[in-house]
Structure formats: C-alpha cells, structure tokens
Amino acid sequence: PAATAPGEIVVNGWSPSKRDNPYANSGMVVQIDVPIAANYLKKNKNSLPENHPLLLLAFQKEVEQAAFKVGGGLQVAPAARLIDFCSNKVSTNLPDASYLPGLHSAPLNEVLPHFVHHTLQEGFKAFGKKMKGYYTNDAIVVATESRTSSPVRIPRDADRLHHPQIKNLYPCAEGAGYAGGIVSAAMDGQK
C-alpha cells in the first residue's frame, strides 16, 4: 500500500526488493485533463472551480477514497480479472497476486471515473490484438494506481526555470509536476 492518508487505496510502485516473486506487474495510466476532472468532481458534489490549483489533487483523492470504500477497507484493494473488467463484470474469484494485504473482487466501474474505465478497457483490448496472451482472465486489474505524476504543478519561469516569485527556488522533476518517472526527472534536472 502507498496511501498517505486514512480512507484511501493507492497501489503504486510496490514490488519485492529482490524482484523474485512469481508475479509480473505494470501500471496502466490514463491522461486526466482538467475540464474532465472538474466535471467528475461536480457530479460528486465537489465544486472546486476549474482553475483551482488543487483541482487534480481533489480528483485523485476522490478516486482513491472510492477504491477504499469498494475494497472493503483495511487497505484491501478492489480488483477484477482483465476480461471481466473489460466486460463490466464482477469476477467470481481472483488469482493470487503480489499485492499485500490482498485483493477484493469488486465492480471497478464504480471505482474509476467512466472515462478512465472506458479508456482502459479500450487500451487492454487493443493490446490484446497486438500481443498474444495479453488479454486473458488470468490477468487482473487492481485499483488504483493514481500516483504516477504530481497532480499539482509548481510554476516556474520558462527561460530561467526558477519560481516566478521566489528567487533561487527551482521547481523540477516529479514533485513539482515536471516529470512522471526517474528518467524524465533526470532529464528535467539536466535542463
């Protein structure tokens, strides 16, 4: 678990340090645009204005809390077999997985916003057409991998790269919202 507050589920970045377990895993992500996130929040009675600097953070929190509720609490993550996920079905059972403290079969369309759920469904089906063995009910979808990049971007001057109001403060890499991983963070640092 990678949650940072009570009542949320985050499954990002967990693998045993020796990388010697029998399971493979990967994170699949969907781009979240501000207008779509604002619409989603309005439907859920959260009325932050579209230009609010913490709008995407509020969106992230809503999804993580939905995962916690559907997962049954105690950091048990909601999950579905891949073909069941793409067919909007609740899996009758789940295979073993590396995520501890465990998984709970759940309707992920109730956890993920519709546009995220639909985009993932289409992506998984497309992968299945290109990679033999990818699209199978032996694979599982676990919710939610919601911390791939910062939902907040700290402003910086385009030329000098420092904060526009604080001299000698140089926002960069993942935490400042300018990268989404180790390689892109290193590239931003080089800049």
Mark where each language-model region is.
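An anion/pyrophosphate-binding glycine-rich loop and adjacent beta-alpha core
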Residues: 1-107
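A generic structural motif
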Residues: 34-36, 175-178
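Short acidic, glycine/serine/threonine-rich loops at helix termini
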Residues: 40-42, 181-184
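Glycine-rich loops and low-complexity Gly/Arg-rich segments
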Residues: 58, 178-180
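A glycine-rich dinucleotide-binding beta-alpha-beta segment and adjacent secondary-structure elements
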Residues: 106-173, 179, 186
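An active-site-proximal "capping" alpha-helix that borders the catalytic cofactor pocket
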Residues: 184-191
